[in-house]
Curated annotation (Swiss-Prot):
InterPro entries: Ribosomal_bL35, Ribosomal_bL35-like, Ribosomal_bL35_CS, Ribosomal_bL35_sf
Organism: Agrobacterium fabrum (strain C58 / ATCC 33970) (Agrobacterium tumefaciens (strain C58))
The gene coding this protein: rpmI
Protein name: Large ribosomal subunit protein bL35
Keywords of this entry: Ribonucleoprotein, Ribosomal protein
UniProt GO cellular component terms: cytosolic large ribosomal subunit
């Protein structure tokens, strides 16, 4: 049976660290920033580590061959 293909959309959105954690950009920065606190805007600038359960789902279903 052939290898499962990596999903291109997931390839652009997630990175797998050397320790196996899945990192993604923080959500909530598309619009409506006027009512957000400065702390929220600063924190959303960077990346976040997905919860372990969510990370496993991403790797299993979308990034089977890693990156």
């Amino acid at each position: 049976m052939p290898k499962m293909k990596t999903k291109s959309a997931a390839k652009k959105r997630f990175k797998i660290t050397a320790t196996g954690k899945v990192v993604a950009a923080a959500a909530g920065k598309r619009h409506g920033m006027i009512k957000r606190t400065n702390k929220f805007i600063r924190d959303a600038r960077g990346t976040m580590v997905l919860a372990e359960a969510d990370g496993k789902k991403v790797v299993k279903n979308y990034l089977p061959n890693g990156l």
